[in-house]
């Protein structure tokens, strides 16, 4: 990556994060990135074990994921925990209606920030189409990379 492109991406990311921080402030209902991603996982799969959720986070310990889920459960009531009936050693996590509302609001705010940006820069239809193609290629690469990261490593 060229130094200029690296700087532009860094600067854009920083400014988007600053705007998010200013808009959300220290609201107790605001979500960290990890909380938001866990809630998105639970939207896709309504019941998951903590281990299943943690599998998506190869460089994050299961205890860190467990602490995040506990915060979503105790402090925010965005998830509920259920003991699995056929194996009482396993706890299932599911998103609550309050959690669904929170993640939908979070995603809507995120979309609004990008919409505001794209309207402000007055991109032409061709530029928007090019950006879509570039983003899709990036998503394709990242999906492949994530799949590789999540594969269990063979133990000697």
PLM region spans:
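Terminal interaction helix/tail motif
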Residues: 108, 112-156
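Residues within the DNA-recognition helix of helix-turn-helix
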Residues: 68-71
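A structural signal for well-ordered alpha-helices, especially hydrophobic packing surfaces
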Residues: 13-16, 20, 76, 139-143
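Charged, amphipathic alpha-helical coiled-coil/dimerization segments
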Residues: 73-129
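N-terminal leader segment of winged-helix/HTH proteins
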Residues: 1-33
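N-terminal helix-turn-helix DNA-binding core of bacterial DNA-binding proteins
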Residues: 21-64
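Amphipathic alpha-helical interaction segments
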Residues: 7, 11, 37, 130-137
């Amino acid at each position: 990556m060229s130094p200029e492109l690296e700087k532009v991406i860094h600067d854009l990311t920083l400014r988007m994060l600053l705007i998010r921080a200013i808009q959300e402030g220290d609201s107790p209902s605001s979500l960290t990135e990890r909380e938001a991603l866990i809630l998105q996982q639970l939207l896709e799969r309504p019941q998951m074990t903590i281990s299943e959720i943690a599998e998506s986070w190869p460089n994050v310990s299961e205890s860190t994921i467990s602490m995040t889920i506990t915060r979503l459960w105790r402090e925010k009531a965005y998830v509920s925990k259920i003991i699995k009936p056929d194996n009482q050693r396993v706890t299932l996590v599911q998103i609550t209606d309050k959690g669904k509302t929170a993640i939908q609001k979070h995603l809507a705010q995120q979309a609004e920030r990008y919409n505001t940006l794209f309207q402000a820069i007055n991109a032409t239809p061709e530029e928007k189409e090019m950006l879509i193609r570039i983003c899709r290629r990036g998503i394709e690469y990242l999906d492949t990379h994530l799949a590789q990261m999540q594969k269990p490593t063979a133990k000697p």
